[in-house]
């Protein structure tokens, strides 16, 4: 009998969505099964990796994250061009950090000018990501949508508070959007319903379920993404049958563990390799949860993520994947010196210390013998029955003859039924 893989049947599929324009356009989504379950369905479009750039020079990035871009971090257009030409980015994500009202609070006009410069430097689709302040994002993204009409941008994040303004601008000027919700299946569906009611075609919408870095945050995000995928695929919920996008790099590299130097945490090993692997592990996790677009930062992390995508999609061996290429100097860590000193003495070799001689404790005087209680005289049950009958004024001999019983029978009956002898005699006499 041949072996057959048990296959799940699906009630729905993820919509295929095309982003960008012309020859540079990319289609994501379109799968008819769970992520990479190609034995159950089709996955016509592999997940893609978008490289992030910032519109300002990052002040708090760890050295490992800055190193690949140290010559271009002050120029967003040059930065984007390097990501495409040198590192093979499928898409570019422009993070508008300058517009944060709590930071530089740059104007919509300045942000739009930066977007135009970046568009002129690349030939791949561009995602424009706001600062997650709903009111400011609405003002800025509406202006960018207008200034970049026909460029097929992807604008986000779009929340319930600003979906009308950004959604209308995206529809009017020919852009796609990213609907964002705070790690909640129902809220993710709700924002898509609101956008559809507004008139936004769902084939122009990507879903941002909110992304956590490694650890507790990622577990939350992963769980919600699985539930979104299950609702779309097995329950046929058309409001959730949309490709998902994860802003991963921004979350991983701001973690304390990704920033700590070898002096701060020598036990965590080489900081450069550590950060790269943290981002790569996060990427694999989100790919398995159903991500169609990963926003990442470090070129070496991206290399590992793309290798995973190709291996799991097309087969092959991971032995062909090039090792991590370091850009910073190697660090020397004496892990043996960090470890606690081990006690290698065998248990049988350890000699117990001789016990100290102590004076023998004084013997306590034996307690005086308790005098034995006098033994009670044995009770004559027959006498007790006769005494009871006499006290009741009953002729015991005549009663026993009449009832055909003995004194022992009366005593036994009293014990069995928990009665007094007097009660038994009275019952026999009645």
Question: Positions of the model-derived regions?
Answer:
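Hydrophobic faces of well-ordered beta-strands that scaffold small-molecule active sites
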Residues: 47-53, 90-94, 126-130, 151-157, ...
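Catalytic domains of carbohydrate-active enzymes, especially glycoside hydrolases
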Residues: 71-97
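Glycine-rich, proline-tolerant flexible connector loops at the mouths of alpha/beta enzymes
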Residues: 60-67, 88-117, 122, 128-134, ...
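Catalytic alpha/beta core domains of metabolic enzymes, predominantly
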Residues: 161-308
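Active-site mouth loops of central-metabolism enzymes
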Residues: 50-78, 103-106, 130, 134, ...
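N-terminal amphipathic alpha-helix/helix-capping segment at the start of soluble metabolic enzymes
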Residues: 1-70, 332-348, 354, 359-360, ...
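Acidic (Asp/Glu)-rich catalytic clusters
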Residues: 84-87, 115-121, 142-149, 166-173, ...
């Amino acid at each position: 009998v041949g072996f057959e893989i048990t296959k799940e049947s699906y009630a729905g599929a993820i919509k295929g969505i095309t982003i960008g324009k012309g020859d540079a356009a990319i289609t994501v989504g379109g799968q008819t099964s769970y992520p990479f379950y190609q034995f159950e369905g089709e996955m016509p479009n592999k997940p893609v990796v978008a490289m992030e750039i910032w519109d300002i020079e990052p002040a708090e990035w760890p050295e490992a994250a800055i190193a690949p871009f140290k010559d271009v971090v002050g120029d967003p257009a040059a930065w984007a061009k390097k990501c495409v030409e040198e590192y093979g980015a499928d898409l570019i994500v422009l993070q508008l950090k300058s517009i944060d009202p709590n930071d530089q609070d740059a104007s919509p006009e300045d942000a739009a000018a930066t977007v135009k410069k970046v568009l002129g430097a690349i030939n791949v689709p561009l995602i424009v990501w706001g600062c997650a302040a709903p009111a400011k994002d609405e003002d800025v993204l509406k202006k960018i949508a207008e200034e970049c009409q026909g460029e097929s941008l992807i604008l986000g994040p779009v929340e319930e508070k600003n979906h009308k303004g950004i959604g209308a601008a995206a529809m009017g000027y020919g852009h796609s959007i990213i609907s964002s919700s705070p790690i909640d299946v129902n809220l993710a569906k709700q924002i898509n319903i609101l956008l559809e009611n507004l008139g936004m075609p769902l084939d122009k919408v990507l879903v941002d379920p909110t992304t956590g870095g490694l650890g507790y945050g990622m577990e939350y995000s992963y769980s919600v993404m699985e539930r979104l995928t299950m609702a779309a695929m097995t329950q046929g919920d058309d409001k959730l049958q949309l490709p998902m996008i994860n802003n991963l790099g921004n979350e991983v590299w701001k973690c304390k563990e990704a920033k700590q130097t070898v002096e701060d945490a020598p036990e965590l090993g080489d900081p450069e390799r550590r950060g790269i692997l943290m981002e790569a592990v996060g990427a694999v996790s989100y790919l398995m949860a159903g991500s169609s677009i990963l926003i990442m930062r470090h070129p070496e992390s991206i290399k590992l993520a793309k290798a995973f995508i190709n291996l799991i999609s097309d087969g092959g061996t991971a032995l062909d994947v090039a090792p991590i290429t370091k850009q910073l100097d190697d660090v020397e860590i004496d892990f043996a010196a960090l470890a606690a000193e081990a006690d290698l003495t065998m248990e049988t070799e350890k000699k117990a210390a001789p016990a100290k001689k102590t004076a023998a404790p004084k013997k306590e005087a034996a307690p005086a013998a308790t005098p034995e209680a006098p033994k009670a005289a044995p009770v004559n049950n027959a006498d007790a029955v006769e005494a009871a009958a006499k006290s009741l004024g009953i002729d015991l001999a005549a009663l026993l003859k009449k009832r055909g019983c003995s004194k022992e029978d009366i005593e036994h009956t009293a014990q069995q039924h928990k009665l007094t002898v007097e009660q038994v005699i009275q019952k026999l006499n009645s």
